[in-house]
Amino acid sequence: MRSLACERDERLLFSDLSANFEAGDIVQILGSNGAGKTTLMRIVAGLSDSYTGEVLWNNAPHRGYDFFASVLYFGHATGVKQTLTALENLRWYFGLNGNKNTSAQAIDVSEAQLEAALHKVGLAGYEDVPCHQMSAGQKRRVALARLYCSKAPIWLLDEPFTAIDVGGVQQLESLIRAHAESGGIVLLTSHQPVSVPNLKTVDINQYRPLRGQKSDMAVGNDY
């Protein structure tokens, strides 16, 4: 990220934000409520044009196929299809997006791996339950199960610990550590402490403008 600036409703959220991430990094995005943590995650994921500056992947703009094929984005919306079962959702997700290793090469995900992922997030016995019959927390677990099968090198996780219990948090932290140790990059936001070694941080509050400062940025539109 190089000299990023972003506005919302003609108000500058942050400016001159620069950071470099390398293989093995686990980075927590910090900031007060409304500071723009989710906005920054969406910018990095390529889901927002409302900024100036650059986001580079392998020294190239982060808009090409190679970048999108290398990212798993977990946002506030789970992306779970209500009419499908938990297992069908995972089949649909990996059938639509494919699964890539850290070199962005396609790899297969077996039925056994999908079922094991649901077990790991505490949904054993829910494989064939339609998601419209599940609670909000259970739907979030279905979405989190993708992480247990994904080999995408970049994980962008916006509040991944929401609606999971202590055991689930510890398990997810272990998964994040393992991903970084295998050469992946993890950017995350969280309202609770994150217990992983060598955790790096980017504090958006350090890049916020003076109170009341307005923006004259010329930016694109979200798509």
From Swiss-Prot:
UniProt entry tagged with the keyword Disulfide bond: no
Residue ranges of domain ABC transporter in the record: 1-223
Principal place of residence: membrane
InterPro entries: AAA+_ATPase, ABC_transporter-like_ATP-bd, ABC_transporter-like_CS, ABC_transptr_haem_export_CcmA, P-loop_NTPase
EC number: 7.6.2.5
SMART domains from the UniProt entry: AAA (SM00382)
Family, as annotated: Belongs to the ABC transporter superfamily. CcmA exporter (TC 3.A.1.107) family.
Protein name per its UniProtKB record: Cytochrome c biogenesis ATP-binding export protein CcmA
Organism: Saccharophagus degradans (strain 2-40 / ATCC 43961 / DSM 17024)
Gene name of the encoded protein: ccmA
